[in-house]
From Swiss-Prot:
This is Alanine--tRNA ligase. Its EC number is 6.1.1.7. The gene is alaS. It is found in: Cytoplasm. InterPro entries: aa-tRNA-synth_II/BPL/LPL, Ala-tRNA-lgiase_IIc, Ala-tRNA-ligase_IIc_anticod-bd, Ala-tRNA-synth_IIc_core, Ala-tRNA-synth_IIc_N, Ala-tRNA_ligase, Ala_tRNA_ligase_euk/bac, DHHA1_dom. Disulfide bonds: none annotated. One of its GO terms (cellular component) is cytosol. Belongs to the class-II aminoacyl-tRNA synthetase family. Gene3D superfamilies: 2.40.30.130, 3.10.310.40, 3.30.54.20, 6.10.250.550, Bira Bifunctional Protein, Domain 2 (3.30.930.10), Threonyl-trna Synthetase, Chain A, domain 2 (3.30.980.10). Pfam families: DHHA1, tRNA-synt_2c, tRNA_SAD. The lineage of its organism: Bacteria, Pseudomonadati, Pseudomonadota, Alphaproteobacteria, Rickettsiales. It comes from Rickettsia bellii (strain RML369-C).
Length: 877
């Protein structure tokens, strides 16, 4: 049996099926498109789901893929096992071949057997097959093609060997291929009591999609039978590299060795588990970020954060004091970047996000671990950490629940899940109630029924501002009605065709008027449901509207033109950002309104003023060049080949609309645009800010709204001139003079404040409270700067050798603590310790400084009267 590299195995699998007339389909992103049932793509068939159900047609009937997959949330959550078992991963690659109504069982089994035994040269006596217990047909093909005797074909009665897409829909029996790693390894054949051992490992699963489940009692034959197969690349590589643990294959070993060279800790004993966790999680984090996910406190972003923080905690175990993950990224890009070029394109962005998140977490990791250690100090094996503490670790220190569980795993201490969930529910109750009342759902069954009955709405608005159409449906209070007669009532209207653009792709929907012989309707918004149905949000102004009557649809042309202007400007902005900031920039969201545009991008840091000017200048240059805006229909494949930018995670039909603006912008888009770039007029960025880690938001205005902005700025400038009694030529000089005078006054005020706090030696002796062998001056002050309080404390402690000075300041509902200690007694009392303890007492997070001077903060004003008692107890200790 030959030994292959991971890359060779992937390539050989794809080449084999391409040679057998399969179309090589690239891996889809890890984020499923329009599939709320899945958080992440977890198998090769996900991107073909609608093909199997007949909802989508592809220009091929056989396919081969190497699909990026991830299991770390929901039903498929392998996170807690990753690194500790031989085959659990968060990120993995699933090799697969698929047939959509072409070949079936016999050919699928032949392809698999031929590839394994001839191309990969696996010994035939090492292979076994399972079939569903009633699938005599598959068993007969295994006998015919592989020459298997009955004892090599294992019949399985459970649903492990029968697959279904859901309660209803396509389904069918499975056949799995198992490899025998040898009797030196514990484990039994599938179906035996020892089947969970590591000796017999499933390497390929074939699903024979031959039935459709109509209801719980009825299953019929599908008119076109299909094949869905999956082979885990990491498992297959372990077999072909003669190892029994996936983490021992070349790809993981290279990452682990690279990490070991950085950390200088040997890969042995308990450390090997941490190295495996880091290697696995590096892949998951990097591919998630490359596919557009960034760390956040909810949804996919929170799963990413959980994975990242678990890896960071294991880096901490290995003694890493500095951010580590981003240092490993170049090795991963070197290993996998050619196969998945998105890694190369987004490398700088991934690196920045990894580093930022690790820096952020390291600030709380130590404190969280300290709290966990204190809370479990008296817990023995079999004990349980309270849900309240687990929630505090989550809420205050950023510890995901499964990270806390992972830390306690080796000590056999459990976590009170119920208590944790109760704390979580209490915190989220208000948000949950708000969410439950959030409007109409675009996925209500009503809309599926409407689509099935009336089909898609034809959009006429690319070329027409006004058109006739037929009203096919009226909806009021989430129900279909035949007519609407109450004046000023709101309702939804659907037509067979319309020039109104339904909100999608970031572009707001049109407004306008609909008229029939019997009524006049104001359209206050236009939406798009299910991607196909254009829905007019209406108010009846006159008469009575009835279904099935003809109507005239007329958009507000001025409103639409401003939408066109800002939408086209968004395309130019996107293209220019690529030029100036880099190819890692991807669109994370947008809003095209009539008076402004908003554009969210993946970028690790704030744009500099110089970058903003460069972006504005380049966009305006393209506008002035007055390029023609061309729109062309072409295949998605041709569009991508020509370099058209597509929105991340967006799914496109086989034929797409491509919008081209000069040689700068080429983008897939279904929105409405200007005829020439000059129609935009001009472009001005109004703000740039962060909305999440690694996500920047740019807002801008175009055309007449730039003129409006200039006039507003001029008006503001004039008001300032009038207030300062100057003109624009002398304004800067006047402001600088005022600022200089302010600085002088602040210095004088600072001296005054310091003088008010200063005490002579005699005054100190008289006012200080004596505690044992030291003197204490404690003072509560209002609205004084921390710098002044620090200087005052230092001044006093230099005058007397046995003095402790504590100022507690109250400034805008925030508390500050300043502790000064004479150097002669810092061997007995530490200013940093006292400041930290007082901060914690006042609801702060601690603080610190030098033994002789330290500052910290607090927030609990109610405890102010008890601060002195707390201080005295610290000094008495």
């Amino acid at each position: 049996m030959s030994k292959f590299t991971t890359e060779e195995i992937r390539s050989k699998f794809i080449s084999y099926f391409k040679a057998n007339n399969h179309t090589h389909v690239s891996s889809s992103p890890l984020i499923p498109h329009n599939d709320p049932s899945l958080m992440f793509v977890n198998s090769g068939m996900v991107q073909f789901k609608n093909v199997f159900t007949g909802q989508e047609k592809r220009p091929y009937d056989k396919a081969v893929t190497s699909q990026k997959s991830l299991r770390a949330g929901g039903k498929h959550n392998d996170l807690e096992n990753v690194g500790y078992t031989a085959r659990h991963h968060t990120f993995f690659e699933m090799l697969g071949n698929f047939s959509f109504g072409d070949y079936f069982k016999e050919q699928a089994i032949y392809y698999a057997w031929n590839l394994l035994t001839k191309e990969f040269e696996l010994p035939k006596d090492k292979l076994y097959a399972t079939v569903y217990h009633t699938d005599d047909e598959a068993a007969s093909y295994w006998k015919k093609i592989a020459g298997f005797s009955d004892d090599r074909i294992i019949r399985i009665k459970t649903n492990d060997n029968f697959w279904s897409m859901g309660d209803l829909g396509p389904c069918g029996p499975c056949s799995e291929i198992f490899y025998d790693h040898g009797e030196q390894i514990y484990g039994g054949l599938p179906g035996t009591k020892d089947e969970d051992g590591d000796r017999f490992i499933e390497i390929w699963n074939m699903v024979f999609m031959q039935y459709e489940q109509i209801n719980k009692d009825t299953r019929i034959d599908l008119p076109k039978k299909s094949i869905d197969t999956g082979m885990g690349l990491e498992r297959m590589t372990a077999v072909l590299q003669h190892v029994n643990n996936n983490y021992d294959i070349d790809l993981f070993q290279e990452i682990i060795s690279f990490t070991e060279n950085i950390l200088k800790v040997k890969v042995e004993a308990e450390a090997k588990f941490s190295y495996r966790v880091i290697a696995d999680h590096l892949r998951a984090c990097s591919f998630l970020i490359a596919d557009g996910v960034v760390p956040s406190s909810e949804g996919r972003g929170y799963v990413l954060r959980r994975i990242m923080r678990r890896a960071m905690r294991h880096a901490h175990i290995l003694g890493s004091k500095e951010p580590l993950m981003y240092k490993l990224l170049p090795k991963l890009v070197d290993l996998m970047g050619n196969t998945y070029p998105e890694l190369k394109r987004a490398e700088s962005f991934i690196s920045s996000i990894l580093e930022q998140e690790e820096i952020r977490f390291k600030t709380t990791l130590e404190r969280g671990l300290k709290l966990l250690s204190e809370e479990t100090e008296n817990l023995n094996a079999g004990g349980r950490l309270s849900g309240e503490v687990a929630f505090k670790l989550y809420d205050t220190y950023g510890f995901p629940l499964d990270l806390t569980e992972d830390i306690l795993k080796n000590r056999n201490i459990a976590v009170d899940h119920q208590g944790f969930e109760q704390q979580m529910l209490e915190q989220k109750e208000c948000a949950r109630k708000s969410w439950l009342g959030s409007g109409e759902s675009k996925t209500d069954q009503l809309w599926f029924d409407i689509k099935a009955k009336y089909g898609s709405t034809e959009f006429l608005g690319y070329n027409l501002n006004e058109a006739d159409g037929k009203i096919v449906a009226l909806i009021k209070d989430n129900a279909l009605v035949n007519d609407i007669s109450e004046i000023d009532t709101q309702f939804l209207l659907i037509a067979n065709q319309t020039p109104f653009y339904g909100e999608s792709g970031g572009q707001m929907g049109d407004i306008g008027v609909i008229k029939t012989q019997n009524c006049e309707i104001e359209v206050i918004d236009t939406l798009k449901y299910l991607g196909f149905i254009i829905v007019h949000k209406c108010v009846l102004k006159k008469g009575k509207v009835i279904t099935d009557e003809n109507a005239n649809f007329s958009i507000d042309v001025k409103y639409r033109q401003n939408l066109r202007i800002h939408h086209s400007a968004t395309h130019l902005l996107h293209a220019v950002l690529h030029q100036i900031l880099g190819k890692h920039v991807t669109q994370k969201g947008s809003l095209v309104a009539t008076s402004y545009l908003r554009f969210d991008i993946s970028h690790p840091k704030a744009l500099t003023p110089e970058e903003i000017v460069l972006i504005e200048d380049k966009v305006n240059e393209i506008i002035r060049d007055n390029h023609e805006v061309d729109t062309t229909l072409m295949s998605t494949e041709d569009a991508v080949k020509q370099g058209a930018m597509a929105l991340f995670g967006e799914k496109y039909d086989s034929e797409v609309r491509v919008v081209k603006m000069g040689e700068t912008s080429l983008e897939l888009c279904g929105g409405t645009h200007v005829r020439h770039t000059g129609d935009i007029g001009c472009f001005k960025i109004t703000s740039e800010s962060a909305i999440a880690a690694g996500i920047r938001r740019i807002e801008a205005v175009c055309g007449e709204f730039v003129i409006k902005l200039i006039r507003e700025k001029e008006g503001l400038l004039k008001n300032i001139e009038n207030s300062l009694k100057t003109n624009k030529n002398e304004l800067v000089s006047k402001v600088n003079n005022i600022l200089e005078r302010n600085k002088e006054l602040e210095k004088e005020l600072e001296k005054t404040y310091l003088a008010s706090l200063d005490l002579s030696v005699e005054q100190i002796e008289k006012q200080a409270e004596k505690i044992k062998e030291i003197k204490l001056i404690y003072c509560h002050v209002e609205n004084l700067d921390n710098k002044i309080l620090r200087q005052a404390a230092e001044n006093l402690t230099k005058k007397v050798e046995d003095l402790v000075v504590v100022y507690v300041g109250n400034n805008s509902s925030k508390l500050s603590i300043t502790v000064g200690i004479s150097r002669a007694i810092t061997d007995k009392f530490n200013a940093g310790f006292i400041a930290k303890e007082l901060s914690l007492f006042l609801g702060g997070s601690g603080g610190g400084g030098q033994p002789s001077i330290a500052q910290a903060g607090g927030s609990d004003l109610a405890k102010l009267p008890k601060v002195k008692d707390q201080l005295q107890s610290l000094l008495d200790a």
